[in-house]
Amino acid sequence: MSFQFSLTIMLYFQMVIMAGTVMLAYYFEYTDTFTVNVQGFFCYDSSYTKPYPGPDESSDIPPVLLLSLVTGVPVLVIIVGETVVFCLQVATRDFENQEKTLLTGDCCYINPLVRRTVRFLGIYTFGLFATDIFVNAGQVVTGNLAPHFLTVCKPNYTALGCRQFTQFITDANACTGIPDLVIKARRTFPSKDAALSVYAALYLAMYITSTIKAKGTRLAKPVLCLGLMCLAFLTGINRVAEYRNHWSDVIAGFLIGISIAVFLVVCVVNNFKGRRTEHEHWPTENLAQMPIISIPRVENPLEKNHLTAFAEVT
């Protein structure tokens, strides 16, 4: 099997994985394939009686704005960053650190600029859908209630026989409110907005830190990266302030987004470092500069006895 044929097979395999990830995220997000777990509640529980904040579109950070930022900003920054790095390498003739043009499949030569850009954006997109899947799976399995759940649920406490605050209601038909709002209020753990925002911010911050090597950016890079993380933190704070999520929901979303971003950057794209061919791992000119390690010789008792016997015979 030729090397080009192996690359073609791997390319198709990765496309199948990406398509499957997108389809799974679609089924979680826009279909009723996965039923939300119906979690019970205590009568008159003050943890779930916060006022209804309105639809997500009325939030200070609506879904359209959030999705536009987590998709548009990383794409723009990575494209501009890779273009600048490539142009600087060509201008300074820094061909050692520049990736080579490779043959993919049977006919296609991919430029290093295009290859790095597609690789980093592809991994980012995969992580974005993976974060969405993790969050939706957690929401479906737990069915955790929003702070305004009882406000939209509108349970009939008299019919349910609520005479004590400690009485636990497990009836799936206890709510008399709008079904769509009730289902939405059952899907809060973990917070999707917190997970997506911190994933995008951390991935972009690690890209900026690992890629930008220009002089005079000793303070610019930390300020820019911390600014991105601050925006993600404010997104989580906004979810709690508007009574759309609990603190535990936001913290869990942060942990999911951070974990996926760190895993992809460290283990998959190798901290955004360029790939090198096999003969570049150990340059010939550097072999002479390598320290020589002398390993002590361990005598074999059998060999020693053999030499002694041979000396006696002679």
From Swiss-Prot:
Can you list the disulfide-bonded cysteine pairs? none
Please name the Gene3D superfamilies in this protein's record: Phosphatidic acid phosphatase type 2/haloperoxidase (1.20.144.10)
Keyword set includes Membrane:
yes
Q: Transmembrane region positions? A: 5-25, 61-81, 120-140, 194-214, 223-243, 250-270
Lineage top rank: taxon: Eukaryota
Q: Name one GO biological process term.
A: phospholipid dephosphorylation
| Subcellular location field | Cell membrane
- What does this chain do? Induces filopodia formation and promotes neurite growth.
Indicate what this protein is called per its UniProt record.
Phospholipid phosphatase-related protein type 5
The source organism is Xenopus laevis (African clawed frog)
